[in-house]
Amino acid sequence: MSAQTKSKTEQNKAVTEEQANDGLKESRKLFLASSFKDVAKLFADFTGEELKGKSVTFIPTASIPESVKFFVSSGRKALEKLGLTVDELELTQATGEEIRNKLEKNDYIYITGGNTFFLLQELKKTGADKIIIEQIEKGKTYIGESAGSIIMSPNIEYVKDMDDCRKAPELSDLSSLHVVDLYPLPHHTNFPFKKAVEKIRAGYGEQLTLYPISNAQAITVKGAEVRVVGK
């Protein structure tokens, strides 16, 4: 391929990606939390919809390498309390067909906290990352908790002081789903992540658009509108 042809190809690719990103910005509806159980009412307010009887694809995969997993059951119970039917999808155990079917058929997508690096590794291995982006582009509401919020950013390298990247030995590329241009920073002021959050803010605060949120807060995204809600 000649330099001129290559340059033109790259330009065309850039235009396509920019257009796709613009389309995503128009359709996206995201609720990004640190601790969902603490902000479940804010989610109900955010949707403005009757939640009873609706279904949510619940992905707990990020919790697999973690020794502490209470947040998985807490998040599930909070969703059920809102009247949602929880349909679990564990990526490491599901077929490609099961992953696509569940992500497409349910009304919402929810990804729990856990190890962000392991989560991204499994999303990429299974192709679930692309399907989730497709569903967000079609207007489906996405709910993220901690690691599930972080993966919406362009790249997850910034949380290496919060999560152990060694838990994802097959992950070589830290570029993430890039549904938002900002970088969620969960558990701001909350034990046991307070020191890690401050270290990330000190190291990346001038380079990245960090959005620190406590367990009582969430980042809401509707189209181009981004807000932090909660106390």
Q: What do the predicted segments below correspond to?
A:
Residues 13-108, 112:
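N-terminal beta1-alpha1 cap of cysteine-dependent amidohydrolase-like domains
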Residues 65-67, 118-121:
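A generic structural signal for short coil/turn motifs at secondary-structure boundaries
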Residues 37, 63, 115, 156, ...:
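Short, glycine/serine-rich, charged loops/turns that create anion-binding
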Residues 3-5:
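Bacterial Sec-dependent signal peptides at the C-terminal "C-region" and cleavage site
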Residues 31, 142-143:
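Structural detector of well-ordered beta-strand residues that form the stable sheet scaffold
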Residues 112, 120-141, 148-231:
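Active-site-adjacent pocket-lining segments in enzyme domains
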